Amino acid sequence: MLCEQISEYVDVSREIVKVMVSDSAAGALKKSLDRQEAMIDSLLDTEVQASQLIRDLMAVEEKVAQKLLDTEETKQKSSSKLQKIDRELQERMEKNASLESSIKFLQKDLEELKVMEEEIADMQREADEDTTTVIPSAVYLAKLFHNVTKIDWDYNCDPSLIKGIHYGGDIAQPISIDSNQHSKIFICNYLWSLLSTDW
């Protein structure tokens, strides 16, 4: 469009020169001058419009460039945030794996404790049975042996010694036998010899 207007302006200028050279009428000259003025006004308007278009284009380019910068910054922030989330996820997965391992160990310990508890309960039942059955029976036998033999045993002496006091006769008789020096048969016969045969 601008090229066409310049071409028209050149044509008008040529016509003006022709009129001036050919001594044409003043009306034709005025017409040509009016046409030239109109062309100049049109050129000025076109220049103003072109300048405004250039300014608008530069403003649009500036906005697009700023938007690109903002988009890149947002992208970098998002990428950084994504990496942070990924690291946190990895750490939590590792922590979760560690917790699962700890839970398995604790479950194993719990099972072992349950087994131990059952064993302790069995031992407690056996101990209760001993308390209610074996111990009274042993006490009864000990009293029976004491009543029959009339011997008070010394349970605090050396294990290799058999010590006590026999109260079966008129006089209390101490007993002290070294089991390392005498056979079991001898010791048994000796103790039986202390018992009274009078019933």
From Swiss-Prot:
Subcellular location: Nucleus; Chromosome, Centromere, Kinetochore
Pfam families: Spc24 (PF08286)
Matching CDD domains: RWD_Spc24
Gene3D superfamilies: Ncd80 complex, Spc24 subunit
One GO location term (cellular component): Ndc80 complex
Any one GO MF annotation of this record: microtubule binding
Location (main, coarse): nucleus
Keywords: Cell cycle, Cell division, Centromere, Chromosome, Coiled coil, Kinetochore, Mitosis, Nucleus
Alphabetized InterPro entries for the sequence: Ndc80_Spc24
The protein's role, per its UniProt record: Acts as a component of the essential kinetochore-associated NDC80 complex, which is required for chromosome segregation and spindle checkpoint activity. Required for kinetochore integrity and the organization of stable microtubule binding sites in the outer plate of the kinetochore. The NDC80 complex synergistically enhances the affinity of the SKA1 complex for microtubules and may allow the NDC80 complex to track depolymerizing microtubules.
Subunit composition and interactions: Component of the NDC80 complex, which is composed of ndc80, cdca1, spbc24 and spbc25. The NDC80 complex interacts with mis12 and zwint.
Full protein name: Kinetochore protein Spc24
Organism: Xenopus laevis
